Curated annotation (Swiss-Prot):
Record has DNA-binding as a keyword: yes
Species of origin: Methanocaldococcus jannaschii (strain ATCC 43067 / DSM 2661 / JAL-1 / JCM 10045 / NBRC 100440) (Methanococcus jannaschii)
SMART domains, per database record: TAF
Protein name: Probable archaeal histone 1
Top-rank lineage group of the source organism: Archaea
Amino acid sequence: MAELPVAPFERILKKAGAERVSRAAAEYLAEAVEEIALEIAKEAVELAKHAKRKTVKVEDIKLALKK
């Protein structure tokens, strides 16, 4: 189960045009987004380490998103 709250994903699905959203669908979307975010975060951490920094900066996230 995802660590992120499910309610925001229900709102995202409704904003995308869904009239009704099952809890399972919102949970699945939350899990998928969490997996993708974790991969981006891992890449950003590696970029920060490569730059000899302990702090992940917005540039690291932007570069990680491009990969």
